[in-house]
Design a protein with these regions (language model features):
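Beta-sheet repeat architectures centered on beta-propellers
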Residues: 9-257
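A short beta-strand motif characteristic of beta-propeller blades
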Residues: 3-7
């Protein structure tokens, strides 16, 4: 709604990034931040990490955004075609995450394939970059038959840069979600880690089963994971099953050196 005389001292870097969400407006600003209007105040909602990625792109004027609501969570999703990236902001949790789709060979498209969204015919309809039309469905764990890679990275684990020995790591994930047959009948969770700030990751990625259908007491445990001064853990699931991570627990021994 236009308000004669109202003025916000913040430019816009991409016309396609401007969308309405929850009685407000969100857009990509001319300083490479993502802003949300709070009255006439352009509040910054992007993080430094998101902004650092955006500033790497040669062109951001082609950025496009969409919004939708899922189980009470309102999402602002912005895609950078030239930069090859998609970021999503959850207004309920105030957290960002990245989305990436894959082709038939399992290679990354460099962005989320969804290009448009509309509530129609009692469904949450989407259109993808190839012109396909589908809908968002919690019971579908792929995208038009293409694999969806779920990747979750935790915050760095450290103790003032002193040596730490990790003897055990357990993740609480919804288990017993296996399918009746085919890929996903014995779903797996994969763990790797980085001890150098995310520059390199372990080649050996131990697997832990997520439990076949009905195995609800299955546990996800990794042991004897060595020493480090700082570590980032990363969990990956590619099987077409539900991925619900609740919490994680680790047992570590401290050293004074």
């Amino acid at each position: 709604e236009r308000n004669p005389g109202a003025f916000i001292e913040q430019g816009c870097a991409a016309a396609g990034s401007v969308v309405a969400l929850d009685n407000s407006v969100i857009w990509l600003a001319d300083d490479f931040t993502v802003r949300r209007a709070d009255g006439y105040v352009p509040m910054r909602i992007s993080t430094h990490a998101i902004e650092a990625e955006i500033q790497k792109y040669s062109d951001v004027s082609d950025a496009v955004a969409l919004t939708y609501t899922d189980e009470g969570h309102k999402f602002y999703v912005i895609t950078f075609p030239a930069g090859g990236a998609t970021f999503a902001f959850d207004a309920a949790t105030q957290l960002w995450h990245e989305r990436d789709s894959r082709d038939g060979d399992g290679d990354s498209l460099g962005r989320w394939r969804v290009n448009a969204y509309a509530d129609a015919y009692g469904k949450r309809m989407v259109g993808d970059v190839t012109g396909r039309v589908g809908f968002l469905d919690h019971d579908a764990h792929d995208e038009f038959g293409f694999t969806v890679r779920g990747l979750l990275a935790g915050p760095p684990i450290h103790r003032d840069r002193k040596n730490i020995a990790m003897s055990r790591f357990e993740v609480d994930i919804e288990s017993g979600v296996g399918l009746n047959s085919g890929q996903g009948s014995d779903p797996q969770a994969q763990l790797d880690w980085s001890d150098d700030g995310g520059h390199t990751w372990t080649d050996l990625k131990p697997w832990s089963g997520m439990g076949k259908i009905g195995q609800y007491r299955h546990r996800f445990v990794w042991r004897r994971m060595g020493q480090f001064r700082e570590r980032i853990l990363r969990l990956e699931v590619t099987d077409p099953v539900r991925r619900a991570v609740v919490r994680a627990h680790t047992e570590i021994d401290f050293s004074e050196t």
